[in-house]
Amino acid sequence: MAAQPFILTIDGVCPFCYKIRLIVSRRITMRAPFQILAIPYRIVDGTPMYCVFHRADHDQWQFIAGGGEDNETPLAAAKRETFEEGGVHSTQWLGLKSLSYIPVTIISEMRRKHWDSSTYVIPEYTFGFECQDDVRLSPEHTDCVWLTYDEANQKLKWDSNRTALYELNCRLKKANEKEA
């Protein structure tokens, strides 16, 4: 009998000892042909602040990013990735119109082997979410910082992140004007 494959996933970090809790499961997920980008924000003294993450595997700053699994919707994938990478949940999500396409070559061949062979680019759906909780970094990141729009715009590596940040900042400013 062949050995069954297993998946080792991070369940979270113990709030008492800060050890990472792991789950071993036999469920193998299929990578969906889309990417998500999730932008954490909070309003501090009337000013939107954005949390930017430093990648552990590359010297670059970006927002939370990842791919869909199985039949997840982009929003469900964004919520899952947000918890996996930042340890936070939010009930305030805003779907953005910013949409980029990225080359499939950023996804490992193993993860995209079930995709149609004519798939060369995949969409990157973007979301903003209100983040009131403290961020708990996953091993995918070495640091995160809360920045103003201008500071975040300067620090971000990818144009798609800056474009989505611009849209979210415009939407938050407009919402703030309506409340005033």
Which role does the model predict for each range below?
Residues 33, 63, 120-124:
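Short connector loops at helix/strand junctions that flank enzyme active sites
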Residues 7-9, 16-22, 26:
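Short, positively charged and aromatic/hydrophobic N-terminal segments
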Residues 124-166:
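NUDIX/MutT-family hydrolases
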Residues 47-91:
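Conserved Nudix-box catalytic region and its N-terminal flanking loop in Nudix hydrolases
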Residues 40-42, 54, 130-131:
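Residue-level signal for short segments within beta-strands and strand-turn junctions
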Residues 29-49, 70:
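Conserved N-terminal beta-strand and adjoining loop/helix that marks the start
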Residues 87-133:
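Active-site segment of metal-dependent pyrophosphate-handling enzymes
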